[in-house]
Amino acid sequence: MTDPIADYLTRLRNAIMANHRVVEVPASNLKKEITKILFEKGYILNYKFVEDGPQGTIKVALKYDPATKANAIKCLKRVSTPGLRKYTGYKNMPRVINGLGIAILSTSQGVMTDKEASQLKIGGEVLCSVY
């Protein structure tokens, strides 16, 4: 697999489109950090790391509105790909839907959102955008 982050986002998108409550994805440190950010920002209901085998899996519980059955995640988009890396400085962070969504960056200080990176005045690789 050439792009495990794109595979992770695609698994989440497919589970959302199929109205699944829980999705299991192969674990990695980067996927754990992205999942943690999605949980902290309220895009997913819960997550759990399961150590089964050499790699382990992450069980992600997706968040739906009980009244309308609408998902909290409207769009998951991969920005930087292995063939075309996208980097940004702290002065020109990408704005996702005028600040309503988040961009997830990989920086020298770790994986964080665009707002956190702007406050710390550091740039990095834009992994994905979520709204």
Stretches with model-predicted labels:
Residues 1-131:
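Core subunits and conserved enzymes of cellular information-processing
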